[in-house]
């Protein structure tokens, strides 16, 4: 399945198509969006965003704790969409 992923970035909002077996960061790059990242392995917070609608599968991540995940934080480099989802990007500095 392919879902609509809406990315709310500092430079505007864009909606991209993202297959359920493709990481959000990869799909964004394929669509020509320039999102922050570093390790691409789910073990840092450079690519962090915040889910404001919908859900993602980020089981491959190893950086966020349960409280951060409950608050909606997501590592876009290891996040698969589980449906249509809205993510605010560039949220690394908001992670407490």
Curated annotation (Swiss-Prot):
Top-level taxonomic group: Eukaryota
Positions bound to [2Fe-2S] cluster: 39, 44, 47, 77
Annotated 2Fe-2S ferredoxin-type domain residues: 3-93
GO cellular component: chloroplast stroma
Molecular function via GO: 2 iron, 2 sulfur cluster binding; electron transfer activity; metal ion binding
Key words, A-Z: 2Fe-2S, Chloroplast, Electron transport, Iron, Iron-sulfur, Metal-binding, Plastid, Transport
Co-factor remark: Binds 1 [2Fe-2S] cluster.
UniProt keyword annotation of Plastid present: yes
CC cofactor: [2Fe-2S] cluster
Pfam families attached to this UniProt entry: Fer2
Stored InterPro entries: 2Fe-2S_ferredoxin-like_sf (IPR036010), 2Fe-2S_ferredoxin-type (IPR001041), 2Fe2S_fd_BS (IPR006058), Beta-grasp_dom_sf (IPR012675), Fd_pln (IPR010241)
GO annotation, biological process: electron transport chain
Compartment(s) of residence: Plastid, Chloroplast
Listed PANTHER family: FERREDOXIN (PTHR43112), FERREDOXIN-2, CHLOROPLASTIC (PTHR43112:SF3)
Family note: Belongs to the 2Fe2S plant-type ferredoxin family.
Described purpose of this protein according to its UniProt entry: Ferredoxins are iron-sulfur proteins that transfer electrons in a wide variety of metabolic reactions.
Name of the protein described by the UniProt record: Ferredoxin-1
């Amino acid at each position: 399945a392919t879902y609509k992923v809406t990315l709310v970035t500092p430079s505007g909002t864009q909606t991209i198509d993202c297959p359920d077996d493709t990481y959000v960061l990869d799909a964004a790059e394929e669509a020509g969006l320039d999102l922050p990242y570093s390790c691409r392995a789910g073990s840092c917070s450079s690519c962090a965003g915040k889910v404001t609608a919908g859900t993602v599968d980020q089981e491959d991540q190893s950086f966020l704790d349960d409280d951060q995940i409950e608050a909606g934080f997501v590592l876009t480099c290891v996040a698969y969409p589980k449906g249509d989802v809205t993510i605010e990007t560039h949220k690394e500095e908001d992670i407490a």
